[in-house]
Amino acid sequence: SLRKTDREKGSDYYNTLKEYIHANCQPIQAAKSLYLHRGTLTYRLNKIHSLTGLDLNDRDTILYLDLSFRIEDLYQDENLLP
């Protein structure tokens, strides 16, 4: 999983993906939110694709990720996640 990779390698792929999805897949907006150069964001998104196989150009994949992140946020807001 991306979280495991982040823990093991000190990367930030999970938050990068989450912010990219929350920015409606707008790379400039996501890069600004993450305080990254757009090239760095692109590198991370490519790395995420190679690690997970996720097609970030597929609308169904984006919808699935968006819903997953929103559900996670709701659970965190209610302190329901461990």
Language model features by range: what are they?
Residues 1-82:
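Cytosolic nucleotide-utilizing catalytic cores of signal-transduction proteins
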